[in-house]
Amino acid sequence: MEIRNIAIIAHVDHGKTTMVDRILHQSNLFRDNQEVGELILDSNDLEREKGITILSKNVSVRYKETKINIIDTPGHSDFGGEVERVLNMADGVLLLVDAFEGPMPQTRFVLQKALELGLKVIVVVNKVDKPNCKPEDANEMVFELMFSLDATEEQLDYPVVYGSSKNGWMGEYYNTPTTDVTYLLETIIEHIRPARENPGTLQMRISSLDYSSYTGRIAVGRIHRGSIQMGDKVSIVQRNGELHYATVKELYLFEGLGKVKTKERIVNGEIVAIVGLENFDIGDTVADWENPEGLTSIAIDEPTMSMLFTINNSPFFGKDGKYVTSNHLRERLFKEIEKNLALKIEETASPDSFLVYGRGILHLSILVETMRREGFELQLGQPKVVAKEVEGFLHEPVELLFINVAEEFSGKVIEIVTKRKGDILNIEKKEDRVNLEFKISARGLIGLTNPILTATEGEAVVSHRFKDYEPWKGELTEKRNGALIAMETGTAIAYSIDKLQDRGKFFIDPNEDIYEGQVIGENNRQDDLVVNVIKTKKLTNMRASGSDDKTSIAPAIKFSLEEAMEYIGEDEYVEVTPKHIRLRKIMLKEHERKRQKNA
């Protein structure tokens, strides 16, 4: 049986998961009575909500005499290390674009890697049922993008499939709907070359990890050369060249949405999962027992940002979560680095705190959000960028920032970004919207999204990706306003909040429990202000002629986890529990903060 391994590249919300659902339905993988959660690929709750793929999945379908392994790629450059490993398993890629929007900035990052690896591209223009969409323009934009990424002539001669995965069809022309997605499957078989036979000694690069509480870590990868069978003795060639030996206890193939155990000998081209290996990492090679030869290892992206993770020691600790001790935190973090390779963890002088290094705010916030849902309580310090010395000079990570915004707001956006030492690279007008491209230090990105969304009335689409390390740009001048800090522990009273509204904006609602030292709002001025919001109104037995004043309180500002991480200052923590996200000063008592300031 021939095998085709194909990776899918798509921007958030361009219909990738729906398309895979359709292909699975077409090959009747669901029994008619089986309840299927829509969005099969995004298997983790967070992925479904955020619409991003974090870890790649494998799904496999059979069509005629061919087995097609569909590999999902993460669409965001924070997960860049994952992208390159996944593409190494593929023979070709499906580039999925929205007929209305065309290819988006994040897609560019993954596509560039695919072209560099010499993979054949099939372009799928999806959502052609959208009103006002321009499928031909979208295709034209893909051609320009691939041309600008130095695609070869053969790569530029790509097949195009039009369709609507929502309505369940794919065809040759966008204006003639078909009845199913057969045309897409036929195109894959015709244009993507099957894996060629590659006899010789075994070579398989470990591209991803699975974990089972029964068998431990499972190595997943594509057999590059030779063959493998249950019971084989193999060697593991690590990235640094060290050798370990192991036996293949169990071997699994991907079928449909799951894995099937096999006792057959599996030859090169197939993607397998191996149980029974120890001492391995992603990027290592599973090789022949007698003549081990390692494949060239793939560089894993270096972390660009670090954050302090520490146990929750606020006055409200232990109220919401079930995992609150430093042992819980340590175990969970060290378990995470087994499969999340772009993370690094460093112990600090305190046994309760750890420095966690990652690829960016999104990368770190996904970890925190996952832990929060598992029942952890923890606190986070201000994110800091990871600088390094190059030839004796300090260098910092620089990112490319893409902002799509309505034309009338473009001036405001440019002003906000350039204040943070961002350089404008490109302005492209598309009807009444503008695409802006900047180069900005990773420090300048922290806390940038909020002011941009405020200035554009929530209309901007912001994305960014890592570019390179460049010389340190000096201090950033822009500072946020000071904090409104709670004076006492208790319940916030509407009357007090109302009387203090002229001092700033609040992050809490009336009747919310708060503690001394909690950051409950933002001051209108640059310095911090301690306020008492648990004071009630003094009552007298005299009736006022105008009856009581009604309170009218502006709605509280509520932060998402990422926004809170970007917002806090150096002397603040984000307190994260399964039910709450609070901001607080590291030193809760005012006299301690004053003493430290004067020290």
Pin down the residues of each PLM region:
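Long insertion/accessory domains within large nucleic-acid-processing enzymes
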Residues: F254, G258-V260, H395, I440, ...
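Helix N-cap motif at beta-to-alpha junctions
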Residues: R225-S227, L277-N279, G358-L364, A406-S410, ...
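Interdomain boundary/hinge elements
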Residues: E35-L41, L149-V161, A195-R205, G241-F254, ...
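Canonical P-loop GTPase G-domain recognition
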Residues: K120, K130-E190
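P-loop NTPase switch module centered on the Walker A-proximal segment
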Residues: M1-V97, E101, M141, L209
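Short glycine/threonine-rich beta-strand-turn micro-motifs
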Residues: S164, T348-H363
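A short, contiguous, amphipathic alpha-helix enriched in charged residues
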Residues: S314-I337, K550, A554
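Conserved nucleotide-binding/hydrolysis modules and their immediate coupling elements
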Residues: Q203-M307, F317-K319, N481, G490-T540, ...
